[in-house]
Amino acid sequence: MTQTLRTKNLKPLVFVVVLTALVSRADIASESLPPALLGSAGPLQGETLNYYGNAAGYLVAPEGQGPHGSVILIHEWNGLTDRVREVADAMATEGYIALAADLYSGRTGSNPRENMALVRETLADPGTLIANLDAAARYLNARHDSTGKVATIGWCYGGGVALSFALGGVEHQATAIFYGRLLDDPEQLKRIDHEIYGTFAGQDRSISVDAVNRFVTALRSAGVPNDVHIYDSVNHGFWLHVDANPEVRSAPALDAWNRLKRYLARTIGS
């Protein structure tokens, strides 16, 4: 496979650390950010979808007959929340059928202890996780308004699950990982047959810069094309929670969003 690594500068590091100076923090903070970043688009537009067992997913489709590409959104460690549903709405506005998956069978955690219990319970049964996402992908592919092209997008816990799905799930065309757990074994990564998108945080204490560099090195060794960036001034969870520190998080979150839109356009765009 011909490698088309999209990281901008390969000297001397495996990949570039993207500075928030790409865009002025003050300029971004004073502007209206897109709803995908702040969840400010108003009432939710979608509906609950029971697509697998007790999974209560959230489905929203764009206007028009299509056909449209599809995205599966995979939640953070606390479960499927309205914040992820808001991103699904934003994806529909961009022209994609969006299904926010539910990997916790309708449950959400309200504190770190509950969140970690849900993470451990579900990661202990990876077959069920993959079956859940397989069902989501098959549902999307079977829709009359679907192009049959599917991407997964996951944050934190969901980012790691998205990578696992890229290794062992039904056919899909794109995987976007936001600060999720990684692998650095080229032999395993050779099973991926599509470009990988990655957004990571330079101040992340759980997914280190070294870990991300090893991941990119392994992707390159495996011949997997990728668009992976680290944003140096932010920490874990920044993209879904810009409002917690907008002065610092707005610029990198907006850059990551624009990269994601370009990635989806070239991988699943109709």
Task: List the predicted regions and their residue ranges.
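A conserved short beta-strand
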Residues: 171-181
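Gly/Ala-rich beta-loop-alpha elbow adjacent to hydrolase catalytic centers
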Residues: 154-158, 162
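Short alpha-helix in the alpha/beta-hydrolase fold that links the catalytic acid
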Residues: 87, 208-218
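C-terminal catalytic histidine-bearing segment of alpha/beta-hydrolase fold enzymes
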Residues: 220-270
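Alpha/beta-hydrolase fold nucleophile elbow
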Residues: 144-155
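Short beta-strand/loop motif that positions the catalytic acidic residue
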Residues: 198-200
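Serine-hydrolase catalytic machinery in alpha/beta-hydrolase-like enzymes
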Residues: 32-145, 239-242
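Acidic catalytic loop of the alpha/beta-hydrolase fold
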Residues: 203-207
